[in-house]
Amino acid sequence: MDWEHPENNVYHVTEEFTVSSWDRLRKIRPDVVLFINGIPFAVIECKSPTVDIQQAIEQTVRNQGTDYAPQLFKFAQIVLAVGMNEALYATCGTGKKFWGIWKEQDEAFMQQSLKKYVNGRLDTTQDRAIISLLSKERLLELTQFFIVYDGNIKKICRYQQYFAVKEIIKTINQNDIRCNRQGGVIWHTQGSGKSITMVMLAKFLLMKLAGQPKIVVVTDRKELDKQIAQTFA
């Protein structure tokens, strides 16, 4: 996989990709599967705008079960349920109630992409979600830096976490004439994924910044030390 030069990879998209269960008693046919270099990276279930999008989520969760085709989802990084005016995403193994929406914050990127891919008609929520999550550079970036394991649970970033990390990186890369950097504060509510955001940021810094960056984690309570250590482990 060429992470630095996405254009060097080979991309394929299939419709109704058929996968059999291990006992060949059942077959699944995801509506769309995206392959990169022959590896299934994204699986999409599409529904009519008149059908509850939860059906697409339930179908995708079911298809990952041992009685269906878990082998397809061993490699997939992103799963989507789309229905023209709705779109929800997750990663493999995510429970139904944890699927989320993506709100694109880089409007210049979105408008440029819409002009390129959606020309001559009004764009939809489905269009925006696919562009935000499955554009070549974005999909590889999400896979490399923004999917982590919390224990045995695979997690993908929320859009707030992604754009928070990107803003931090932007600030870190900006120096004044004396080579000083500005600090900053990322505001979080309780339970919004602060620790996971820190892990994603650390991963990005260690893999992308030149030299040997050092990361210092400071907590204000002793009980947080163990929690943070376990999260980073």
Give the predicted meaning of each segment:
Residues 1-214, 219-233:
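ATP-dependent helicase/translocase motor core
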